[in-house]
């Protein structure tokens, strides 16, 4: 009888201890171990326990999407330099998935980080501009294409002859987004002036996830070969922002995705709502709606400052028009002789920032895959304003309209799509 009682007590004790262990962090760490997964992967863990099991280095689970999320607390909210390190840090912190859309790659550190992430079980999807894969990809693009299981690469081409996939987006564990002007290249890293913003608010992240999925289903597998030339409007309308920043009687969308969102017209509308100031910088400039809005703002007494890359501006009829209308206009290059002023952002009334991959061109609005994100986060807006102030203090003003000497040498068609199809300086990265 005593033996039976001892047995019952022993069983009850084991059950209590097991219950404690199953609800402890030690159990989550144990079940997260790769060896546990390999040898005991067929064990059915109850949903209430399974949902709490994070992946390696994970700190929380997103219940809405039921996936593990890495610790991104050390990833800065924005940056203007060492942008390759920011992307690598975000990749290294990822534990479940990484989705990327990129225009150009020739540096190895980000591909290295993506391959290492794949090797630890992270699912990688990459969309690359069609014309950077065909007819011959760069070595680093080829590495990703040939990386094997766990990294899937697709290509995407804009419409007409001029459209490109110009986004520079990464999405990590469906939890944070990086975007901005930064391509994964030597020039962008060491010679250009660039920016990157990091989005952690769910409203932004969800929008970018939808945009990526929208692009992914339209992108071509490598086995499908290069894309043919496609007509304007072929892709339809991308996901639209359903949340807004209300300011000056206007609903500023949280984001704008191209092609198909009339982005240049909506940016012009935003400029029309400015009451005190418009500070704008772009790499290339051919959008008449934006140029007209800038001139209207200046003529109604708004404090306008416009900045463009010097080589691109000299061949821009819209830049020349601003100058001739008296709009305060400056130009500058990059960090060195090979570099560019590659930023593309606008600050309205020192309150609203719009930044992303979108150059102020009709092509970017109509034919290319682009993104613009808007925020009224005062810390971020002020950081960009401080950076713009520094840029503007370092830039110079044209001495006469004659300095826009590249304009007269361009065909009208090239003027419309300036910067997206013509390389005026073989040493300078275009777009």
Question: What do the predicted segments below correspond to?
Answer:
Residues 12, 418, 428-431:
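N- and C-terminal low-complexity/disordered segments
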Residues 219-225, 394-413:
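Charged phosphate-binding loop/patch that engages nucleotide di/tri-phosphates or the phosphate backbone
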Residues 102-103, 282-283:
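Glycine- and other small-residue-rich loops at beta-strand/loop junctions that grip anionic moieties
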Residues 2-25:
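Classical Sec-dependent N-terminal signal peptides that target proteins to the secretory pathway
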Residues 106, 110, 286, 290-293:
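Secreted/periplasmic proteins that engage bacterial cell-wall peptidoglycan
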Residues 27-94, 104-272, 300-388, 403-404, ...:
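HKD-type phospholipase D/PLD-like phosphodiesterase module
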């Amino acid at each position: 009888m005593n033996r039976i009682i001892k047995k019952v007590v022993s069983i009850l004790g084991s059950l209590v201890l097991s219950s404690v262990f199953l609800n402890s962090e030690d159990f989550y760490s144990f079940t997260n171990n790769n060896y546990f997964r390999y040898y005991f992967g067929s064990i059915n863990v109850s949903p209430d326990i399974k949902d709490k099991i994070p992946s390696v280095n994970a700190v929380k689970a997103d219940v809405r999407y039921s996936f593990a999320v890495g610790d991104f607390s050390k990833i800065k909210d924005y940056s203007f330099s060492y942008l390759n390190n920011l992307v690598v840090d975000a990749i290294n912190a990822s534990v479940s998935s990484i989705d990327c859309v990129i225009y150009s790659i020739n540096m190895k550190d980000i591909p290295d980080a993506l391959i290492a992430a794949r090797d630890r079980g992270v699912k990688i999807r990459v969309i690359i501009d069609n014309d950077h894969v065909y007819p011959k990809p760069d070595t680093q693009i080829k590495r990703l294409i040939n990386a094997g299981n766990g990294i899937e690469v697709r290509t995407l081409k804009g419409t007409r002859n001029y459209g490109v996939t110009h986004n520079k987006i990464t999405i990590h564990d469906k939890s944070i987004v990086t975007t901005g002007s930064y391509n994964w290249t030597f020039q962008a890293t060491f010679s250009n002036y660039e920016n990157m913003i990091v989005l952690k608010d769910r409203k932004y992240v969800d929008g970018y996830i939808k945009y990526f999925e929208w692009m992914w289903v339209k992108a071509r597998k490598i086995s499908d070969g290069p894309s043919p030339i496609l007509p304007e409007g072929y892709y339809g309308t991308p996901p639209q922002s359903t949340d807004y920043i209300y300011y000056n009687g206007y609903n500023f969308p949280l984001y704008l995705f191209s092609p198909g969102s009339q982005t240049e017209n909506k940016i012009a509308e935003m400029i029309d709502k400015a009451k005190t100031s418009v500070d704008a910088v772009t790499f290339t400039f051919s959008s008449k709606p934006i140029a007209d809005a800038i001139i209207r703002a200046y003529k109604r007494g708004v404090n306008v400052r416009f900045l463009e890359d010097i080589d691109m501006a000299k061949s821009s009829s819209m830049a020349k028009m601003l100058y001739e209308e008296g709009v305060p206009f400056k130009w500058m290059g990059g960090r060195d002789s090979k570099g560019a002023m590659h930023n593309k952002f606008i600050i309205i009334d020192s309150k609203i920032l719009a930044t992303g991959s979108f150059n102020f061109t009709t092509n970017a609005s109509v034919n290319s895959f682009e993104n613009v994100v808007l925020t009224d986060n005062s810390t971020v807006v002020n950081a960009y304003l401080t950076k713009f102030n520094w840029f503007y203090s370092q830039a110079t003003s044209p001495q006469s309209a004659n300095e826009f000497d590249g304009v007269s040498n361009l065909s009208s068609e090239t003027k419309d799509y300036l910067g997206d199809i013509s390389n005026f300086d073989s040493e300078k990265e275009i777009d």
